[in-house]
Amino acid sequence: MATNVKKVKKLRPKNVTVGIAHIHSSHQNTIISFTDKQGNVISWASSGSVGFKGTKKKTAYAATLATAAAAQKAREHGIREVIVELKGTGQGKEAARKQIITSGLNILLTKDVTPVPHNGTRPPRKWFKRQEKR
């Protein structure tokens, strides 16, 4: 009987020296993706893909491990310098930025692109109650 053989794609270096590090840090997870200037994803990782589950995904430690994993893959593809775009209000935002520095990538620019409504629609009721407690 024949067995199914799984084909493994060989990593081909993309030879991109300058990229963009998108860090999306929500209240429950942190997602890091490295792209080139056009927005094509080179590598990515999240707190869940590194192995954390449940409430541990939102911690700063989980964000640092996810950033280290994504940065390692990005370095294999040739990225040496990054522009960091931070989005969200989670715990892992600053921890992920610091981990990019310690992983050996040079930061050219840091931008905070968190969307802020300028008197848009009324927020959901659950969000409204959370603001009253503060």
Swiss-Prot record:
Region of interest (Disordered), ranges: 114-134
Encoding gene, per UniProt annotation: rpsK
GO annotation, cellular component aspect: ribonucleoprotein complex; ribosome
Alphabetized UniProt keyword annotations: Ribonucleoprotein, Ribosomal protein, RNA-binding, rRNA-binding
Pfam entry (one): Ribosomal_S11
Residue stretches spanning the membrane: none
Signal peptide: none
Name of the protein this chain belongs to: Small ribosomal subunit protein uS11
GO molecular function: rRNA binding; structural constituent of ribosome
Assembly and binders: Part of the 30S ribosomal subunit. Interacts with proteins S7 and S18. Binds to IF-3.
Family membership: Belongs to the universal ribosomal protein uS11 family.
The organism of origin for this protein: Mesomycoplasma hyopneumoniae (strain J / ATCC 25934 / NCTC 10110) (Mycoplasma hyopneumoniae)
GO biological process: translation
HAMAP family: Ribosomal_uS11
Biased composition range(s): Basic residues: 123-134
Described function: Located on the platform of the 30S subunit, it bridges several disparate RNA helices of the 16S rRNA. Forms part of the Shine-Dalgarno cleft in the 70S ribosome.
